[in-house]
């Protein structure tokens, strides 16, 4: 299964849906699945806290990948690769597997921190559930190092969606190129 990871606003859902359409594949967005099963993510966080959300989200991931419907492409939640190791009994091994899989792609507007932060904040503030610019900047700065530190291939998304899709298809066809 192809898995797209990265911060909120990196383009995981848009690019995942376009990639699925181009490949005739099945696409799932973990945030959309969470919302369908558990309700609004912000409300869930307010009522239960981040740790409960992360635990539920990892459990949902396993339910989906182990379920009866085969998934070809999945966009993971923005913080999925940054949860605490003990959040779920199988999370540490899963995170290690995802980080090193040739079918996992880290989507970032740029691999340069300042360009990435600026673009993520700009994109996130256009969303209806956006936090303040300061909070969005804090979140991406905290998570950026984790994303660029993953051994999975990084794909910059400050280009047309079709160009990103073409890059993903080429990488999948040719193996991992770093």
Which positions does each model-derived feature cover?
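The conserved Walker
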Residues: 8
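Conserved glycine(s) of the Walker
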Residues: 11
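Glycine-rich phosphate-binding loop used to anchor ATP phosphates in small-molecule kinases
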Residues: 52-101
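Residues at the beta-strand->loop junction immediately N-terminal to the Walker
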Residues: 5
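A glycine- and Lys/Arg-enriched "phosphate-lid" helix/loop adjacent to the NTP-binding pocket
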Residues: 98-145
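Short glycine-rich anion-binding loops that position phosphate/pyrophosphate groups of nucleotides
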Residues: 77-81, 110-112, 160
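Conserved substrate/cofactor phosphate-moiety recognition/catalytic segment
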Residues: 21-60
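NTP-dependent small-molecule kinase module
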Residues: 2, 14, 18, 22, ...
